[in-house]
Regions:
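C-terminal non-catalytic regions of proteins with extracellular/luminal or membrane-system context
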Residues: 1-203
Length: 203
């Protein structure tokens, strides 16, 4: 249906995903304690793009398989999007009335593509646990409001993080940013705007 109504029945193409998984089994990567990685993505077909054109909202899901105990590498498939992922976002944004990109990731990732392709919304879902899918559905359908302070600061560029310059030595960590580690660095800057509604008036 082009219009999502309460109680409406949706056609879900289960066989599409089942066939994909058979041909592209889950990649276990290098296991626990390794750098996060990504699974192989489907190529966007003309049939998919036609669905995106006809419907009110298109969802694009980007995922990372967290590798516990490791930070991202500044490489495609880890911190950066792969060419396939970026192409998927670009092509859907070009034809869809409204595009929502859902980031099913456990770490922050590069967000430079947002300015490039201008999706109408981006939803970071982090590690939602067994109820994560239901929580995402509640946000996307408007059952709950997606508001609140993020647990992480997502910088526009990886070089905006002060630790980037000194990161990557396999034997030592250099905290040249002193006590301004992580959120403390960003909290030392005043926010550029207040998200509350403001009015100017005369006393």
């Amino acid at each position: 249906s082009a219009q999502l109504q309460p109680g409406a029945k949706l056609l879900v193409r289960h066989e599409l995903y089942e066939d994909w998984i058979k041909e592209n089994p889950y990649d276990e990567g290098q296991g626990w304690g390794r750098v996060p990685w990504c699974q192989k993505e489907m190529d966007v077909t003309e049939e998919m793009l036609d669905c995106a054109r006809r419907n009110d909202v298109s969802l694009v899901v980007i995922g990372r398989t967290a590798g516990e105990d490791q930070d991202n590498n500044a490489k495609a498939g880890s911190y950066c999007l792969t060419e396939t992922e970026e192409d998927m976002i670009r092509r859907v944004c070009e034809v869809s009335k409204r595009t929502v990109v859902v980031l099913n990731v456990g770490n922050i990732i590069d967000m430079s593509w947002v300015e490039k392709y201008r999706p109408q919304a981006v939803l970071y879902v982090w590690q939602g646990g067994q109820e994560g899918g239901n929580g995402v559905a509640d946000v996307l359908t408007g059952k709950v409001c997606a508001c609140g302070k993020l647990t992480d600061t997502i910088a526009a560029d990886i070089n905006d993080y002060p630790s980037t310059e000194n990161f990557g030595d396999p034997f030592k960590n250099y905290y040249k940013e002193d006590i301004y580690v992580g959120y403390r660095y960003f909290d030392s800057h005043k926010p550029f705007i207040d998200y509350a509604v403001q009015e100017l008036g005369k006393e």
